[in-house]
Amino acid sequence: MGSKTLPAPVPIHPSLQLTNYSFLQAVNGLPTVPSDHLPNLYGFSALHAVHLHQWTLGYPAMHLPRSSFSKVPGAVSSLVDARFQLPAFPWFPHVIQPKPEITAGGSGPAALKTKPRFDFANLALAATQEDPSKLGRGEGPGSPAGGLGALLDVTKLSPEKKPTRGRLPSKTKKEFVCKFCGRHFTKSYNLLIHERTHTDERPYTCDICHKAFRRQDHLRDHRYIHSKEKPFKCQECGKGFCQSRTLAVHKTLHSQVKELKTSKIKC
């Protein structure tokens, strides 16, 4: 009975264009090579089919024992070169060029450790604990990965320590302290006017009556007394006032009179 070969697998991803699929079909049609010529290469087309299927699905490469594929007789290699060109990807990259993976405990495939699956049931516990695999590899604060982890720890800060989003930290307001009584002011002008109450300094003097004032706006309001024009007039009685605050007090008198009249009418 002749040797049976596995059929070529059909790719499950139609969008992926496999240029080596025709190459696999051509390899399946190669004549059977005696086992004494290929002592360590068993089922060439079958192994290649499995490898291509894993390469198509994106699975990790199989760890197969090192074979003597590089010692294939010239008859087979000449047959392969005559019929088609070599594929774009290596036939057995994990065999021809093994990737050295050395861990802290040893070297070789025996020292490889698979990462455990993430447990969503213990999500809060996993977020607070350190990863033992990272500690074994020496990812401390001095390493690049440790520095990145230190930057990511900013997200674990308490709400009091987190920087405000969208707002810059408020500047400290300047305080002006009175040297006489120790009262605080946020503006230097207010402190200047306040200190004049202690020193009784009145730099603004009326030209007509020579009355002095601590503030310039007070002198301005005083000058309306000497002039016939009163800038603030009552709309009900027509009486004029030099200051707006005296007009506001005058309006309260009119409102009180109106309330008394309405209360008498109800009675």
UniProtKB/Swiss-Prot annotation:
Alphabetical list of InterPro entries matching this protein: C2H2-ZF_Transcription_Reg (IPR050717), Znf_C2H2_sf (IPR036236), Znf_C2H2_type (IPR013087)
UniProt-annotated location(s): Nucleus
Asymmetric dimethylarginine carried by residues: R117
Database matches in SMART domains: ZnF_C2H2
SUPFAM superfamilies, A to Z: beta-beta-alpha zinc fingers (SSF57667)
Predominant subcellular localization, coarse grouping: nucleus
Family affiliation: Belongs to the Odd C2H2-type zinc-finger protein family.
Name of protein: Protein odd-skipped-related 1
Organism per entry: Bos taurus (Bovine)
Gene it is expressed from: OSR1
